[in-house]
């Protein structure tokens, strides 16, 4: 099972749709959590759903024929054979999140997470060498899907550390 993760707005769901069109069995971790009731509650301050990641990941392991799991928490599943972290320049990400109507506080929280490599760091702490990092900035969804397909087939390697948006925080 390959897990595709990244800050909300980087293109995971769009990419998942393309991979599905290419014949892969893809599931959204967020949808699974909501549909199967793997919800522990709601964060009282930020309003986010708190997911039972262990239960959701355990359920994923039992699913047959599953190729890809996408979601901004998917890298927390220890059973991922490979993790691909999608990255996007924070200014481009800002436009997407604002376009979705995210409140300013949520936008800023996600921009900071992207600039600080939060998903990449978390993924690397759990999965080490099995983590790849892809900068989607300026690339079409189909170009990103081609890169992901190459990574999955072993013909391309995109090790973590090659994408750095930390300077955005200082600018």
UniProtKB/Swiss-Prot annotation:
Give residues annotated as binding ATP: 9, 11-14, 100
Q: Where is this region: LID?
A: 99-109
Q: According to the UniProt record, what class of enzyme is this? A: transferase
Cysteine disulfide partners in this protein: none
What InterPro entries does this protein map onto? Answer: Adenyl_kinase_AK6, P-loop_NTPase
Gene Ontology molecular-function annotations? adenylate kinase activity; ATP binding; ATP hydrolysis activity
The superkingdom listed in its UniProt entry is Archaea
Please give the biological process terms from Gene Ontology that the record holds.
Answer: ribosomal small subunit biogenesis; rRNA processing
The question of whether Ion transport is a record keyword is answered with: no
Region called NMP, residue ranges: 28-51
Q: What is its EC number?
A: 2.7.4.3
Does the record's keyword annotation contain Transmembrane? no
Q: Which reaction does it catalyse?
A: AMP + ATP = 2 ADP; ATP + H2O = ADP + phosphate + H(+)
SUPFAM superfamilies from the xrefs?
P-loop containing nucleoside triphosphate hydrolases
Q: Which UniProt keywords apply?
A: ATP-binding, Kinase, Nucleotide-binding, Ribosome biogenesis, rRNA processing, Transferase
Task: Describe the function of this protein.
Answer: Broad-specificity nucleoside monophosphate (NMP) kinase that catalyzes the reversible transfer of the terminal phosphate group between nucleoside triphosphates and monophosphates. Also has ATPase activity. Involved in the late maturation steps of the 30S ribosomal particles, specifically 16S rRNA maturation. While NMP activity is not required for ribosome maturation, ATPase activity is. Associates transiently with small ribosomal subunit protein uS11. ATP hydrolysis breaks the interaction with uS11.
The annotated subunit structure for this chain is: Interacts with uS11. Not a structural component of 40S pre-ribosomes, but transiently interacts with them by binding to uS11.
Family to which this protein belongs: Belongs to the adenylate kinase family. AK6 subfamily.
Instruction: Tell me the protein's name.
Output: Putative adenylate kinase
Please report the organism this UniProt entry assigns to the protein.
Methanothermobacter thermautotrophicus (strain ATCC 29096 / DSM 1053 / JCM 10044 / NBRC 100330 / Delta H)
């Amino acid at each position: 099972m390959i897990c595709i993760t990244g800050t909300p707005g980087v293109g995971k769901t769009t990419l998942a749709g393309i991979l599905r069109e290419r014949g892969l069995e893809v599931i959204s971790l967020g949808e699974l959590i909501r549909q199967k009731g793997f919800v522990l509650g709601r964060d009282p301050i930020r309003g986010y759903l708190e997911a039972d990641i262990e239960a959701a990941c355990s359920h994923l392991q039992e699913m047959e024929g599953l190729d890809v799991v996408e979601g901004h928490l998917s890298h927390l599943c220890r059973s991922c054979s490979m993790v691909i972290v999608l990255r996007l320049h924070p200014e481009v990400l800002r436009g997407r999140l604002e376009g979705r109507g995210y409140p300013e506080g949520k936008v800023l929280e996600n921009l900071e997470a992207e600039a600080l490599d939060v998903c990449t760091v978390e993924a690397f702490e759990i999965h080490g060498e099995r983590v790849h990092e892809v900068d989607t900035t300026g690339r079409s969804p189909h170009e990103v899907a081609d890169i992901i397909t190459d990574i999955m087939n072993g013909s391309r390697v995109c090790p973590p550390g090659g994408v750095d948006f930390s300077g955005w925080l200082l600018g």
